[in-house]
């Protein structure tokens, strides 16, 4: 998924092992989805990227960000 797709520059990408895998329109949804994934697969690297500023944040677990 990239910024030229229908979601445009709004929302949040959920990045798993360096690859954009999921999308959420709301930050709270991105945090919940990424946290659930991280709890299920703790060995994977899970991050949330805000499309507005392209900033990446690491997900440490359910509702926990670095």
Residue ranges and their predicted role:
Residues 1-20:
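Short aromatic-glycine-(Arg/Gly/Cys) micro-motifs in beta-strand/loop hairpins
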Residues 21-22, 57:
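Short, isolated positions in well-ordered beta-strands
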């Amino acid at each position: 998924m990239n910024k030229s797709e229908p979601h445009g520059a709004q929302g949040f990408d959920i990045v798993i092992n360096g690859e954009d895998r999921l999308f959420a329109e709301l930050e709270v949804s991105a945090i919940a989805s990424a946290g659930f994934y991280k709890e299920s697969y703790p060995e994977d690297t899970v991050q949330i990227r805000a499309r507005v500023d392209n900033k990446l944040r690491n997900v440490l677990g359910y509702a926990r960000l670095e």
